[in-house]
Design a protein with these regions (language model features):
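A conserved beta-strand element that flanks and buttresses the S-adenosyl-L-methionine
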Residues: 113
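Class I (Rossmann-like) S-adenosyl-L-methionine-dependent methyltransferase catalytic domain
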Residues: 1-41, 45-105, 121-135, 139-191
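Short catalytic micro-motifs in class I SAM-dependent methyltransferases
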Residues: 116-120
């Protein structure tokens, strides 16, 4: 887990015991997700999107393929992840921690997304991250790992090398309400 939490080569492209075991670009892999986000949130050319914890930014790439004039930004803590982004997306990415204040004004983005990132923060770090997503986005969508029962909790604890906040879905919802989050959210489960 220590090696995985560095979020560098070993996490993304090293041995499977440290993370993804080879998170490679596959043309079109993220296209259905990109299209769904564009459709659900009514994005168009000129809209602004921020991806918090973008990793290799493959989703931003697919969104920009569908809407070439979409204004994208993304950040991650991983130098390796950012360096592996598609060339046309790299200029829009920077290294930053999700739990630190974001260098953007209020409501800068038409959509802020964070997929599979926030559960990697410690509980005391979540408040700033969630409040910043709320602050800079007109629309927001967060996806985290959660659990609904003991089996899913066990599976999540066994699988998640980097998760610091392993929470029941009711706890996530409580936190979102407590932090003033008004956006959309979703959970993934390990059944």
């Amino acid at each position: 887990m220590v090696k995985a939490k560095e979020y560098e080569f070993d996490y993304w492209d090293g041995d499977r015991r440290y993370g993804y075991g080879g998170y490679k670009f596959i043309e079109g892999r993220w296209a259905p997700v990109a299209k769904a986000l564009i459709d659900i949130y009514g994005l168009k050319n000129g809209s602004k999107v921020l991806d918090v914890g973008c990793g290799k930014a493959f989703l931003l790439y697919e969104m920009k393929k569908l809407l070439p004039e979409l204004q994208v930004a993304g950040f991650d803590i991983s130098r390796h992840g950012l360096s592996e982004a598609r060339e046309n997306i790299k200029p829009h990415l920077f290294r930053h921690r999700a739990q630190d204040r974001y260098p953007f004004g209020d409501n800068t983005f038409d959509l802020v997304i964070s997929l599979g990132t926030l559960h990697n923060l410690r509980l005391h770090e979540l408040e700033t991250a969630v409040r910043e997503i709320e602050r800079v986005g007109k629309n927001k969508y967060i996806m985290v790992e959660g659990y609904r029962n003991e089996l899913e909790q066990f599976n999540l604890e066994c699988w998640a090398l980097t998760a610091e906040s392993i929470l029941h879905t009711s706890e996530w919802i409580w936190l979102y309400n407590h932090f003033g989050y008004t956006g959309d959210y979703e959970f993934i489960y390990f059944e």
